[in-house]
């Protein structure tokens, strides 16, 4: 039986006054997914929604939830980031998947498609913009018949 998988998509810039709300909503969404049998959680390694999601998953796992955290990185050089939040996320991951060797515009779309293709549920932290990676990923997920849960900011 295929393990139930959930991924996140969302904006890198989350307004300061929305951070606590987004973190709380991500926690609720992840806990509901765990109760529904989800055990594998994938994040794309970007600032903002991805790292908040990863921190929530890592915290639940530390509390004893039998879940795994995966980073789907768009290109290998991303591993060289010195951002402390990124490095904390990487060290918490059970698996790291690198989608492309070199950085390019297309590697981000490759990463987003991988996450959706692997997932049954996509949690989207979305500000209503009609362009960009978040809306692309949401539309791709809907085209693939995946469940999309939106956290509006």
Report the location of each language-model feature.
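Acidic/glycine-enriched connector segments
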Residues: 1-153
